[in-house]
């Protein structure tokens, strides 16, 4: 197959360089977007009378036929086509003849590929937003069922304060909501049409860029043709936002991996979301969260690749930009599969060990802050109360005791304001219940937030 640009050259391209230069192996993923882009372009050329009505209809029908052939599995883009754009153009010419050669009037592959990527990415972002919302709903269902389930809260991976398990789960819903908002913001910058910018300087052909933008569902057009063909910010923003999402999924995964260990034993995995060992018959491995955690680095790598790709590249379009597609293709596939896997894991792959969770908050000093708050309620300055409780913790550790094992007389040795009601305040359930500041882990606050999220997520 002759290259579209071959008449400029005396000799054929080296076979290895031909393969090295080609992008058809991966940009064929854009075939439907490229067909839609070309149909919109043909309609516009007809509207502006660059094409006659019969030529316009012939080209559109030809492109629609190619789409049908592809969807029916009768047409598969491949070498020797250099890229998806020329592949479709060549196919169109073979179907309708010389008229097909008029399709590329007033555009370049530079603005064409930018349009295709944006159409593809816009659709992916819409799907990802739905997947994240489904994951939020899974977290919310677990939270709703565990408002009164207690779990140790950690700072520095040390026991800190007892929490409602629902409060802990709601924290992930908040993170995921920020991810959804970021994707929506990225979509807004994706949804700008570069079509009609041509190679870099626009075109003298009579075109209507606003018409093609409207046909393809874009909100507006690029106002600078150079920027239109050279902008890859939106690719970087998409992968950057995806990297942040993956950091959240990795955080969730790490906690699940810890929770299902014998050392924590806060939860267990069901058979639907765990695997075994080829050697050790007792093993039940958390492969799903481990894979999600591992795939996070993959997305981080794509972000670094894109940032490096655009670094120091002069205006306007450069062949470097061929390297933008595989990172965004793989990122979209990776995050979609990870979100789906995590949703399945939460829905049917994890069971909390309620008794172990309850026991865990009964046998530590995570109620130490509440002991200090008790003294504060007796008009003792907080810093004084803090120091008193520090002394009590040290006293208990030396004797291998907990607060609940002390007698009231022992408490009074440290401060006279202690009374019998201190034991009520120290019960983990009451500790959690009392933290009713807005956004806190108190049951009333958690119930309120569960209801708020039910409204937001329409469940």
Swiss-Prot record:
Recorded catalytic activity of this chain's protein:
2-(N(omega)-L-arginino)succinate = fumarate + L-arginine
SUPFAM superfamilies named in the record: L-aspartase-like
Fetch the PANTHER family from UniProt: ARGININOSUCCINATE LYASE (PTHR43814:SF1)
Location (main, coarse): cytoplasm
Q: What is the lineage of its organism?
A: Bacteria, Bacillati, Cyanobacteriota, Cyanophyceae, Synechococcales
Write the protein's name: Argininosuccinate lyase
Q: Name one GO cellular component term.
A: cytosol
What organism does this protein naturally occur in? Prochlorococcus marinus (strain MIT 9301)
| UniProt GO BP | arginine biosynthetic process via ornithine; L-arginine biosynthetic process
Query: GO molecular function terms here?
Result: argininosuccinate lyase activity
Q: Which Pfam families match?
A: ASL_C2, Lyase_1
Q: Where in the cell is it found?
A: Cytoplasm
UniProt keywords (A-Z) are: Amino-acid biosynthesis, Arginine biosynthesis, Cytoplasm, Lyase
Q: What is its EC number?
A: 4.3.2.1
Which Gene3D superfamilies would you find in this protein's record?
A: Fumarase/aspartase (C-terminal domain), Fumarase/aspartase (Central domain), Fumarase/aspartase (N-terminal domain)
Q: In which pathway does it act?
A: Amino-acid biosynthesis; L-arginine biosynthesis; L-arginine from L-ornithine and carbamoyl phosphate: step 3/3
Enzyme class label = lyase
What is the similarity comment for this entry? Answer: Belongs to the lyase 1 family. Argininosuccinate lyase subfamily.
């Amino acid at each position: 197959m002759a290259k579209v640009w071959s008449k400029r050259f005396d000799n054929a391209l080296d076979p290895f360089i031909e393969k090295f230069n080609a992008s058809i192996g991966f940009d064929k993923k854009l075939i439907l977007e490229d067909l839609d882009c070309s149909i919109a372009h043909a309609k516009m050329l007809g509207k502006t009378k660059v094409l006659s009505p019969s030529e316009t209809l012939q080209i559109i029908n030809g492109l629609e036929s190619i789409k049908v052939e592809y969807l029916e599995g009768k047409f598969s883009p491949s070498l020797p086509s250099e890229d998806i754009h020329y592949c479709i153009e060549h196919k169109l010419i073979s179907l309708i003849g010389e008229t097909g050669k008029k399709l590329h009037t007033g555009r370049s592959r530079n603005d064409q590929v930018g349009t295709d990527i944006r159409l593809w990415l816009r659709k992916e972002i819409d799907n990802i937003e739905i997947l994240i919302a489904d994951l939020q709903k899974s977290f919310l269902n677990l939270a709703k069922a565990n408002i009164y389930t207690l779990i140790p809260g950690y700072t520095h991976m040390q026991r800190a304060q007892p929490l409602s398990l629902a409060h802990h789960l709601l924290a992930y819903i908040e993170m995921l909501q920020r991810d959804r908002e970021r994707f929506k913001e990225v979509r807004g910058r994706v949804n700008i049409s570069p079509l009609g910018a041509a190679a870099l300087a626009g075109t003298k052909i009579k075109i209507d860029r606003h018409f093609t933008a409207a046909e393809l569902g874009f909100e507006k057009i690029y106002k600078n043709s150079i920027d239109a063909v050279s902008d890859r910010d939106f690719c970087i923003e998409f992968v950057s936002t995806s990297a942040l999402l993956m950091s959240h999924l990795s955080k969730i995964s790490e906690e699940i991996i810890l929770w299902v260990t014998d050392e924590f034993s806060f939860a267990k995995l069901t058979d639907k979301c765990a695997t075994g060992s080829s050697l050790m018959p007792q093993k039940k491995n958390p492969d799903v969260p481990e894979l999600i955690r591992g795939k996070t680095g993959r997305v981080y790598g794509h972000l670094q690749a894109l940032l490096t790709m655009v670094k120091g590249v002069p205006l306007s379009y450069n062949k470097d930009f061929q390297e933008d597609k595989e990172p965004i293709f793989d990122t979209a596939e990776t995050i979609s599969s990870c979100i789906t896997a995590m949703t399945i894991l939460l829905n049917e792959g994890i069971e909390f060990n309620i008794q172990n969770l309850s026991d865990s908050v009964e046998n530590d000093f995570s109620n130490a802050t509440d002991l200090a708050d008790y003294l504060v309620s007796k008009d003792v300055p907080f810093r004084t109360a803090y120091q008193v409780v520090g002394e009590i913790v040290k006293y208990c550790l030396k004797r291998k005791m907990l607060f609940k094992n002390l007698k009231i007389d022992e408490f009074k040795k440290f401060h006279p304001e202690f009374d019998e009601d201190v034991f009520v305040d120290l019960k983990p359930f009451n500790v959690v219940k009392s933290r009713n500041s807005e956004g806190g882990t108190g049951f009333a606050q958690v119930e309120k937030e569960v209801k708020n999220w039910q409204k937001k997520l329409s469940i």
